[in-house]
């Protein structure tokens, strides 16, 4: 009883939560507003998808269109991530009560009722889907895939040792970004698939390393995950996924007709950022893995977009100067 009483008094003062009114804080916790890593991982594929489509398109895409789609897809990803977190906590509330790291979440500690959380979650999904009204019709199918897997994810740890594989749906942001710009993914099927494999490997790699912090308690409770299933070879799997992501990014650029700036900045920045993350996280252990992943994601994302941005700028320059003998290779 003392533990429950203490949890109910729990009022975190970290990150953005410190700026929220006391009554709103539990809802901020429910959507992980103080956990920036998840928002990076969900939003960066859309940002890269927009930049990649712009850099590899046969025709010059207007900057105002790119910014419009970037804003809409960023909002969509932020809201979907929030709704997914709330849904995950609703489904996992009984498990969360048994894991020390999650006992202080708002539902296990009783800061929000299940009925209030359910209504809040439904409103988030409706709000996110309302943004689809401003996007091409093809994006409805893409969004349906994303929502389906967001709803499925919390059940994965009950039935499979590989629930992280459900997270690869995040990579579907690439074809959704292409559709949002009026481009057909099938016209660049190989390069598009490489970019999807790239993000899939990144997502699973980070979640695999991040999940190690709960391995001992997951074993006791019976929660399944790749970190539990492969607990004796996590390092090998993590580096393998890192290699796959690096190669997939490289091939995605080459097949899309991208050149030196992409290889130097996007691929090079990815390798440096996540090599740093893996070395630090796998040597130091689970403690502090979130902050290391967050900084590495930020560094890598900046370089992913920088390389693609330079490619787009060069393509625009060539399109605007048709007399230039240098032709874009697409």
Swiss-Prot record:
Its cofactor is Mg(2+). The gene is ausN. Coiled coil: none annotated. Belongs to the UbiA prenyltransferase family. One of its GO terms (cellular component) is mitochondrial inner membrane. Pathway: Secondary metabolite biosynthesis; terpenoid biosynthesis. The chain crosses the membrane at residues 116-136, 165-185, 189-209, 238-258, 260-280. This is Polyprenyl transferase ausN. Disruption phenotype: Impairs the synthesis of austinol and dehydroaustinol and accumulates the intermediate compound 3,5-dimethylorsellinic acid. In A.calidoustus, the austinoid gene cluster lies on a contiguous DNA region, while clusters from E.nidulans and P.brasilianum are split in their respective genomes. Genetic rearrangements provoked variability among the clusters and E.nidulans produces the least number of austionoid derivatives with the end products austinol and dehydroaustinol, while P.brasilianum can produce until acetoxydehydroaustin, and A.calidoustus produces the highest number of identified derivatives. It is an enzyme of class 2 (transferase). Its main location: membrane.
